[in-house]
Every structure is written in structure tokens, then in C-alpha cells.
Amino acid sequence: METTPILAWTLVAECPIPSDVQALLVQGEQAVAAYRTFRDTAIFTSMRLIVRDAQGMSGKKVEIYSLPYSRIDMWSSENAGTLDWNSELEMRTRAGHISVKLGKGIDVRRLNNLIAHMVLHAR
């Protein structure tokens, strides 16, 4: 089933969880892992995926995407092959298809397990 993603992000490398992410979290929510994107960060929390997307020339305008795990209907993961550099996560929600490409060295199975744990326990 091939569909055009409504959103697409590329995670470049794992990074420390930014200290300012605490302001985005609700009571009882914890940041679990963070990854650099080309311009900002994606944070996997105990309740959702948060992606901060810096925009414009200066990067001062920031759009924040929040994808609650409870809204993920189906997902798939694809590991990098011999000639492929990137692995990939595909998530399907009621809003549409979201694609997350993973840079070399990012453990797609770890993220798959994290999403599985969060989605299945959020139901």
C-alpha cells in the first residue's frame, strides 16, 4: 500500500534529550529518547512523538508536531539493506501516512519496540 506521506522526517543521529523539552511535557510524561533532524530534534516520550521543526533562514520560527501513540493505527519498520544507507519507519494514522527515515547507525528495531510498547499499552 503506497501512499504519499503527509509528513516526512529524517532522523540523523541519537542525541541527548534537550533540557528545554520539559516545558512541552504534561504531568507524568517522560522523555525517552531524542534524535537530531537536519534542523532540530525529534523526541520520543512515554506518550507521544514530538518533532520540533525550525523554519526560515534564522530558525527562530519553530513548528512543533505532536503525534500521540494512541493515534497510530498501524506502523512498519524497514532495516537498511546491503546497499541502502537508511532504515525507515512508516506510521499510519487517521490523519494520514507519516514517514520517518533513519540515518545510518540508528537502531530501527529499538524504535520499533518503543513504538510497539507505547502503542499497545496506550489502548
Language-model features: locations:
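Anionic N-terminal interaction surfaces
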Residues: 1-42, 96, 105, 109, ...
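Phosphoinositide-binding peripheral membrane targeting modules
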Residues: 24-41, 45-97
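Short, exposed beta-strand-loop hairpins at the edges of beta-sheets
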Residues: 101-103
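C-terminal output/interaction extensions
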Residues: 112-115
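IQ-motif-like calmodulin-binding regions
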Residues: 119
